[in-house]
């Protein structure tokens, strides 16, 4: 085992200045997908707890599909399947985007973590004590100010343990980037 580590450690950590190391690409995949997915998830979670069914149903369907299919299948759909569509080949921007394995991997990881994080944040918003919401209404807070100052800070504290587990699972999931020809830690 030590022989293997001594032989390959330089290729994992050292760079010649032109290429990123496998560790750097893995961390970049993790950070970019978690940040983009987390930002999207906050807005989707607010819509998910909405009483309006026209807002709530599409978000539920999105989370149902992305949580119900394996990440490997999602990655293959974005990497191999999307490029076979004529609209993707015909549009220059989409063609350039879906031709890159790195872009497809970031998109699949972002949407996957967004679906899981949306449900985590929606559950946290639902579990904010009713007394806090009632107090905000008594002070005359608007809905936007109530979400910004009372509900979201409290919900994010509630969601932190489950969200940290999601970040760890996303770190594990970055290993699938190798299937889309992204030279990550497994290069």
Ranges and model annotations:
Residues 1-187:
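Transmembrane alpha-helices and adjacent helix-loop boundaries
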């Amino acid at each position: 085992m030590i022989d293997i580590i001594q032989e390959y450690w330089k290729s994992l950590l050292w760079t010649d200045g032109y290429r990123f190391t496998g560790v750097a690409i893995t961390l970049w995949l993790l950070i970019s997908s978690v940040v983009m997915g987390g930002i999207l998830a906050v807005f989707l979670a607010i819509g998910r707890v909405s009483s309006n069914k026209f807002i709530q149903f599409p978000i539920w369907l999105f989370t149902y599909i992305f949580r119900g299919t394996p990440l490997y299948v999602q990655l293959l759909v974005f990497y191999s399947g999307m490029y076979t569509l004529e609209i993707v080949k015909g549009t220059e921007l989409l063609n350039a985007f879906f031709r890159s394995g790195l872009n497809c991997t970031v998109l699949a990881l972002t949407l996957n973590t967004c679906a899981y994080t949306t449900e985590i944040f929606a559950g946290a918003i639902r579990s904010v004590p009713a007394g806090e919401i009632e107090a905000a209404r008594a002070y005359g807070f608007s809905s936007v100010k109530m979400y910004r100052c009372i509900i979201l800070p409290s919900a994010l504290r509630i969601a932190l343990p489950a969200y940290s587990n999601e970040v760890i699972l996303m770190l594990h999931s970055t290993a699938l980037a190798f299937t889309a020809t992204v030279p990550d830690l497994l290069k």
